[in-house]
From Swiss-Prot:
Biased composition (Polar residues): 281-299, 307-322
Pathway in which this enzyme or protein is active: Protein modification; protein ubiquitination
Entry protein name: CCR4-NOT transcription complex subunit 4
Effect of residue 45 to A/W: Strongly reduces interaction with E2 ubiquitin ligases
CDD domains, A to Z: mRING-HC-C4C4_CNOT4, RRM_CNOT4
Gene symbol of the encoding locus: CNOT4
Transmembrane feature ranges: none
Record has Zinc as a keyword: yes
Localization per record: Cytoplasm; Nucleus
Domain RRM: 109-189
Molecular functions (GO terms): RNA binding; ubiquitin-protein transferase activity; zinc ion binding
Catalytic activity of the protein: S-ubiquitinyl-[E2 ubiquitin-conjugating enzyme]-L-cysteine + [acceptor protein]-L-lysine = [E2 ubiquitin-conjugating enzyme]-L-cysteine + N(6)-ubiquitinyl-[acceptor protein]-L-lysine
Gene3D superfamilies, alphabetized: 3.30.70.330, Zinc/RING finger domain, C3HC4 (zinc finger)
EC number(s) per entry: 2.3.2.27
Length: 575
């Protein structure tokens, strides 16, 4: 860029390095063509490059073509003029920002709460998950203990809660506003911030953690004191609520609980989708300071001493001494997020009704719970449903969102099917020829009315018959496991050596059951497949024998025992 030596303009930038020209470079023109550069670039071109002028490509002479150093008077004059211009610029900015002293800017992520009792006037308390921490991540909490907000309820504290996200602040306002706690009605709204006095003076603020504004805020969110008295800032808040509701209709519903990997604790999970007039049926599992709400409308009645809306079950015995953080508070005080609200928050104009009410948060405790299970090792119950409720088991009725899968029911049906299949099996392991020889050698087949029954030939044959019965469980181990249930295959009593022989033949009930699942047969009823056998002396029998061992069912056996009869009979059919 060329300029004449006599030009009296403001310093400009060097065309090569784009740095402002210093005062000494104002009258420096190294080339006869009048192309002005700074002395630093001129020295670099001559020493490190080709030494040619960037404009006319002529070699630079040893001495600059025009160089007139400024005198001290000229330097002082230039400095004074520059300072004066800077002061004028600052004054102009201050005059433009002077009207901002009475302007307040609504902060979308700042919640202002009025009406806090002294018990709640603690930043660490308000940051807890039971309180404002449940709505989102909090950046900072500032408590104002000034009594300027005191009303008919007496002096109270106010708090500024700054959230990371603006939607968390709106959710907190909808859930906390007009809630009665400790006999005081809380009022919550978006907070406003004024401009820093140093910013209004166009000066650097010395406070690193200054909470005031140091830059111009949104014009739509800026309101004067007169406009705020007219409620303009509340209209802006309702507008933000409408916009957020259009983007996310379920913004009042908190996100699902998550597990902290470091502490292995469940973070709070709260849902605000229960109507105001219906108390929430939920199961609260407490562990330390954290709690988890599980919605369950079909849960049976809780144990005595616990409210139905919030039964508490301790997870570990080490936390039995856990209490609400507010020891010494009045027990009758209402919970901040209970459903007993005196002034429900109005729905913004122009919006359809919310699918969920914001006033159903019931986990902001104000006093120790009087009948909590944390104080006792036992759980009082009065019915079977109480046990189910005490240990977290729901009723048999499936919730709407359940898939209808009941592991116990499926297992029970599978076991019943397995037993039915065992009863319907027709092909069982056959007896060995030796056992058939023993049984046939000790029994005789009689003809007549009593044919078909096994009659002992001698007293010793009864011992053989007893040994035959004792061998059956060993040869059929699959029936051994059912002996505790079906015990009709035993010989009761020791009144005589062979008491069953003393009964008349007509008093013994003839049982000829076949093992099929539809009949009233005992599971020990055996249909043995026909097989070849040898008679006495090793002579083979031409025909095939079908041996059927039948026992009395459980019901028939008990009936026979009441009449003093022998419940067991052995029936052999020879084909």
């Amino acid at each position: 860029m060329s300029r004449s030596p006599d030009a009296k303009e403001d310093p400009v930038e060097c065309p090569l390095c784009m740095e402002p020209l210093e005062i000494d470079d104002i009258n420096f023109f190294p080339c006869t063509c009048g192309y002005q550069i700074c002395r630093f670039c001129w020295h670099r071109i001559r020493t490190d490059e080709n030494g040619l002028c960037p404009a006319c490509r002529k070699p630079y002479p040893e001495d600059p073509a025009v160089y007139k150093p400024l005198s001290q008077e000229e330097l002082q004059r230039i400095k004074n003029e520059k300072k004066q211009k800077q002061n004028e610029r600052k004054q102009k900015i201050s005059e433009n920002r002077k009207h901002l002293a009475s302007v307040r800017v609504v902060q979308k992520n700042l919640v202002f709460v009025v009406g806090l009792s002294q018990r709640l006037a603690d930043p660490e308390v308000l940051k807890r998950p039971e309180y404002f921490g449940k709505f989102g991540k909090i950046h900072k909490v500032v408590i104002n203990n000034s009594t300027s907000y005191a009303g008919s309820q007496g002096p109270s504290a106010s708090a500024y809660v700054t959230y990371i996200r603006s939607e968390d602040a709106l959710r907190a306002i909808q859930c906390v506003n007009n809630v009665v706690v400790d006999g005081r009605t809380l009022k919550a709204s978006l907070g406003t911030t004024k401009y820093c006095s140093y910013f209004l003076k166009n000066m650097q603020c010395p406070k690193p953690d200054c909470m005031y504004l140091h830059e111009l805020g949104d014009e739509a969110a800026s309101f004067t004191k007169e406009e705020m008295q007219a409620g303009k800032h509340q209209e802006y808040e309702q507008k933000l609520l409408q916009e957020l509701y259009k983007l996310n209709p379920n913004f009042l519903q908190l996100s699902t609980g998550s597990v902290d990997k470091n502490k292995n604790k469940v973070t709070p999970l709260q849902r605000y989708d229960t109507p105001i007039d219906k108390p929430s049926d939920s199961l609260s599992i407490g562990n330390g300071d954290n709690s988890q709400q599980i919605s369950n409308s079909d849960t049976p009645s809780p144990p005595p001493g616990l409210s139905k809306s919030n039964p508490v079950i301790p997870i570990s015995s080490s936390n039995h001494s856990a209490r609400s953080p507010f020891e010494g508070a009045v027990t009758e005080s209402q919970s901040l997020f209970s459903d007993n609200f005196r002034h429900p928050n109005p729905i913004p104009s122009g919006l359809p009704p919310f699918p969920s009410s914001p006033q159903t948060s019931s986990d902001w405790p104000t006093a120790p719970e009087p009948q909590s299970l944390f104080t006792s090792e036992t759980i009082p119950v009065s019915s079977s449903t109480d046990w189910q409720a005490a240990f977290g088991f729901g009723s048999s009725k499936q919730p709407e969102d359940d898939l209808g899968f009941d592991p116990f029911d499926v297992t029970r049906k599978a076991l019943a099917d397995l037993i039915e299949k065992e009863l319907s099996v027709q092909d069982q392991p056959s007896l060995s020829p030796t056992s058939l020889q023993n049984s046939s050698s000790h029994t005789t087949t009689a003809k007549g009315p009593g044919s078909g029954f096994l009659h002992p030939a001698a007293a010793t044959n009864a011992n053989s018959l007893n040994s035959t019965f004792s061998v059956l469980p060993q040869r059929f181990p699959q029936f051994q496991q059912h002996r505790a249930v079906y015990n009709s295959f035993s010989f009761p009593g020791q009144a005589a050596r062979y008491p069953w022989m003393a009964f008349p033949r007509n008093s013994i009930m003839h049982l000829n059951h076949t093992a099929n699942p539809t009949s009233n047969s005992n599971f020990l009823d055996l249909n043995l497949p026909p097989q070849h056998n040898t008679g006495l002396g090793g002579i083979p029998v031409a025909g095939e024998e079908e041996v059927k061992v039948s026992t009395m069912p459980l019901s028939t056996s008990s009936h026979s025992l009441q009449q003093g009869q022998q419940p067991t009979s052995l029936h052999t059919t020879v084909a």
